[in-house]
């Protein structure tokens, strides 16, 4: 139901404002999360929430994406992520950080509203010993923590906030079967939209066929992890080729599936081939009217 509501709202916006859709939205920062301890992780998250609120332009809903690293099964009953300093945090630790991000956003709020998003990745899931069943539960518990965050936001009266989940899903990082289970687990829990802010590594740059991508993936697999169930594509567009690859994914989906594929926005970065604004414009130029006015940016 949340995905349907999101899709209907996006369709209304794109239909009502076809001219405005051609203008790149202002980029807002996303963060790779680090911390030597759970307390440090909470402190950084609070600061990021406050910074995001102070920088947020306009009155629309924007995505605050916090990427906690690679999804992991920590023990027989505990899931979480290993962060970018190779420190493992449980979902309880991550929820504590997400709540502090919500606090920071609320205390520094100026305008607009926010979707605070628990991000992780498919990096070396199988290499860490995780099975496809483990990956399903990782996605399930990620959505569950997003729902817990929403309960916290409601309990605090943070009426300008909501919450969701996300995955940096990249073909080169692990196989398509185990990666799909992250998306399936999220859908199984049922709360969170699952933004795919990953890549389409090695996929074709033209046509609409189910061509081969990196690591045994195909275009259809990228379509699945980005648009199946509660998944919403927020693709990594760092170079012009990426926009072309994702356009092939959209064309394949529209030709093979019953739904109309659209993009929830774009993930950009500093220090790459395209500026964040150019990244959004590159995808929009190939998919006119099908790219939402969202632009998250690592390094901004």
Annotate the PLM regions.
Residues 17-25:
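Sec-dependent signal peptide cleavage junction
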Residues 55-77:
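Extracytoplasmic cell-surface/polysaccharide-interacting catalytic and binding patches
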Residues 74-86, 127-136:
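Surface-exposed, active-site-proximal loop segments in enzymatic domains
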Residues 6-16:
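Bacterial N-terminal signal peptides
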Residues 66-74, 104-130:
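Substrate-binding cleft and catalytic face of glycoside hydrolase catalytic domains
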Residues 66, 167-169, 235:
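Conserved beta-strand positions
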Residues 1-5:
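Positively charged n-region of N-terminal signal peptides that target proteins for export
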Residues 24-60, 81-108, 139-161, 172-300:
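Surface-exposed substrate-engagement region within the catalytic domains
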């Amino acid at each position: 139901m949340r995905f349907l509501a999101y899709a209907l709202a996006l369709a209304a916006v794109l239909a009502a404002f076809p001219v405005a859709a051609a203008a790149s939205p202002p980029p807002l920062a996303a963060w790779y999360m680090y911390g030597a301890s759970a307390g440090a992780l909470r402190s950084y998250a609070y600061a990021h929430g406050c910074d995001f609120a102070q920088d947020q332009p306009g009155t629309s809903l924007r995505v605050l994406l916090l990427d906690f690293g690679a999804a992991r099964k920590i023990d027989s009953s505990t899931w979480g992520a290993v962060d970018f300093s190779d420190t493992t945090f449980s979902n309880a630790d991550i929820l504590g950080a997400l709540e502090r991000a919500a606090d920071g956003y609320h205390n520094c709020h100026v305008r607009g509203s926010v979707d605070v998003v628990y991000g992780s990745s498919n990096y070396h899931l199988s290499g860490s010993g995780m099975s496809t069943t483990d990956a399903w539960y990782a996605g399930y518990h990620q959505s569950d923590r997003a729902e817990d965050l929403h309960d916290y936001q409601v309990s605090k009266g943070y009426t300008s906030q909501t919450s969701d989940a996300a995955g940096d899903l990249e073909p080169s990082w692990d196989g398509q079967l185990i990666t799909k289970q992250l998306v399936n687990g999220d859908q199984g829990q049922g709360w969170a939209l699952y933004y795919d802010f990953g890549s389409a590594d090695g996929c074709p740059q033209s046509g609409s066929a189910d061509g081969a991508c990196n690591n045994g993936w195909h275009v259809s697999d990228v379509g699945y992890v980005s648009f199946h169930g509660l998944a919403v594509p927020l693709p990594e567009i760092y170079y012009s080729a990426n926009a072309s690859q994702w356009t092939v994914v959209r064309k394949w989906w529209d030709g093979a599936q019953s739904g109309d594929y659209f993009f929830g926005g774009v993930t950009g970065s500093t220090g790459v081939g395209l500026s964040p604004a150019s990244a959004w414009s590159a995808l929009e130029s190939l998919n006119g009217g099908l790219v939402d006015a969202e632009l998250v940016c690592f390094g901004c």
